Regions:
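Ligand/substrate-recognition segments at binding pockets and active sites
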Residues: 236, 265, 359-360, 382-449, ...
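Extracytoplasmic/peripheral linker and loop segments enriched in polar/acidic and small residues
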Residues: 325-328, 340, 370, 416, ...
Length: 543
């Protein structure tokens, strides 16, 4: 089984389950969480975390979705990590524009941007007693690359011709040197991804080793980690128990024990949050979370600086979207405010541009939202020269209530400008295939980059002729700028390039950005510390 062709984006915690689109790999109907009675005010009791979807794998080198790598990352360290900044309601949140050392004590970058030298702490050990050293980091990165799953794409920043990484050298136990084939200002963020986690070679070798392009079944449900938590027990699709690693090289985590329940039944999620059985609930539908807004049981926290968005794809190779005037017209025929209020319960931000508001490259001035203006849309349709009425079929995932609501609302407004929209509900596999095989005439989608950086995003989402470019966007002038920004290391010049790409993107109206999604977490009144990161980081969570 190979995953090298998997699209390099992440499925959103708190969104996928909220949409009712549960990955088939999760198998069972979940669990009722009956074992979560230990939640409450006792600080010595386990922290109980309910998550709406179970991971398909916990191997950081193989996982693609946030449910996979977000859970898995807590058992491992990486050379770097995201910085932190203040969040809403007294919480903190990750800062994608600030990358800091994690396992590395120091980082030196050569003047030409090609050679990275990492100094590592001495004496760190895996639970097996093996050293967590430069050889372990080298082995782990090379394992991820050789397996050729999503992890390899993340570590390479999506750059394969030539491969971003030229050589990895363990000069001594505390010195690791990585040489690149070309400068890449985003490389330190690539190393902050769970895909760059440091694994115990002795455990992997004893349990299947590395096979190029293939999954390691043992690592799919076991940890071989170096991180803040040990995996004490794991029942796939049901629950997991994590205990603080007494030999962790860094600061001990805030919680000594965390009980994770995987629950895909939203009424159960809501009941356990309201009753106090769960300390932290992730993935509850916004409708349910909205019912808790004024409930003294809980604190509902919405992080606006998220990096995911709800979109309507209008593939350029399909009529009528090959006409830029038609593409522009439909962007003015979407009642954004109504959708944000009725569908997202206010937990969303309107904008129009290639970068989400939570991304460092976002420029608010260049990303002003399109207004709902039917008369302007009608005028643009007339200017397009396209005869109306036009029949368009939009694919949505079956059971996805949010995207069905969006499609239904748009169906009504587009009728006013001469577009008859047929809503086609597809089973999950058929829906994904219709996009990845570029068969869909239009589609709804929740999207966002696996690595939260503009160059990485543009490298798969906008380049002409890239199969990952699901809407077949093609702006040749922008392609040249994307190639330039991928190798530019000066922050000011990079932002200038990102801004110019945004201008070109907006001019072409390549798709509809319905809204930037806010991530909603529900915390019990006993939770004192919570940190939002698009990949769950349990280290500071506690009560």
């Amino acid at each position: 089984m190979t995953r090298s062709n998997a699209r390099p984006v992440l499925l959103v915690i708190g969104t996928l389950a909220a949409l009712g689109l549960l990955v088939a790999a999760c198998g069972s109907d979940g669990d009722d969480g009956a074992a979560s009675d230990s939640a409450g005010g006792d600080a010595a009791a386990p922290l109980v975390v309910n998550i709406a979807q179970a991971p398909a794998t916990i191997d950081p080198a193989w996982g693609c979705g946030l449910y996979d790598i977000g859970f898995a990352q807590n058992f491992y360290v990486r050379l770097t990590q995201y910085g932190s900044k203040p969040g809403p309601e007294g919480t903190t949140q990750f800062d994608p524009g600030n990358i800091e050392p994690y396992f590395a004590e120091s980082i030196d970058i050569s003047e030409d941007g090609l050679v990275y030298t990492f100094k590592l702490p001495a004496g760190a050990k895996f639970p097996s007693g093996e050293p967590v050293d430069a050889d372990a980091v080298k082995y782990s990165l090379e394992r991820t690359i050789k397996m050729a799953g999503c992890g390899g794409y993340f570590v390479y920043d999506g750059i394969y011709e030539p491969p971003l990484i030229k050589e990895i050298e363990a000069q001594d136990p505390t010195t690791l040197v990585i040489t690149l084939n070309q400068p890449n200002a985003n490389f330190l963020q690539d190393l902050a991804q769970p895909a760059a986690s440091v694994v115990d070679e002795s455990v992997v070798a004893a349990n299947g080793g590395i096979e190029e392009g293939k999954v390691n079944e043992y690592m799919s449900s076991n940890a071989a980690g170096s991180g803040p938590f040990l995996l004490e027990s794991y029942e796939p699709n049901k629950r997991a128990v994590l205990r603080a690693n007494p030999d962790f090289f860094g600061d001990p985590p805030a919680s000594k024990e965390i009980l994770v329940n995987f629950i895909n039944a939203d009424p159960t999620m809501l009941l356990q949050a309201r009753s106090g059985q769960a300390d932290i609930s992730l993935g509850m539908t916004k409708q349910s979370a909205n019912s808790l807004r004024d409930d003294p049981c809980c604190k509902v926290v919405a992080n606006e600086d998220t990096t995911f968005w709800e979109l309507i794809g209008t593939p350029w190779k399909k009529k009528p979207w090959d006409n830029v005037k038609v593409r522009e017209a439909v962007t003015y025929a979407v009642p954004y405010d109504e959708i944000i209020e009725k569908v997202a319960y206010g937990w969303a931000t309107a904008y129009y541009g290639p970068y989400a508001p939570g991304m460092a490259e976002f420029n608010e001035e260049l990303s002003q939202p399109r207004e709902f203006d039917i008369e302007r849309a009608k005028q643009l349709m007339q200017e397009s020269g396209v005869a109306t009425p036009v029949d368009v079929t939009i694919n949505i995932p079956e059971g996805n209530t949010i995207e069905e609501q969006i499609a239904t609302i748009v169906q009504g407004t587009w009728r006013e400008i001469g577009i008859n929209l047929k809503i086609n509900k597809l089973a999950s596999t058929d829906y994904i295939n219709s996009m990845e095989q570029h068969k869909a005439q239009a589609f709804t989608r929740i999207d966002g980059p696996g690595v939260v950086e503009g160059g990485y995003l543009l490298g798969y989402d906008m380049l002409c002729g890239i199969s990952f470019n699901l809407a077949d966007i093609c702006i040749e002038e922008a392609d040249k700028l994307i190639a330039e920004v991928r190798t530019e290391t000066d922050p000011t010049k990079r932002q200038e390039l990102f801004d110019e790409i945004a201008r070109l993107w907006v001019e072409q109206s390549p798709r509809i950005q319905v809204y930037a999604d806010h991530f909603v977490s529900v915390l019990s009144k006993n939770v004192k510390n919570y940190h939002y990161q698009h990949e769950m980081d349990f280290r500071t969570w506690g009560k």
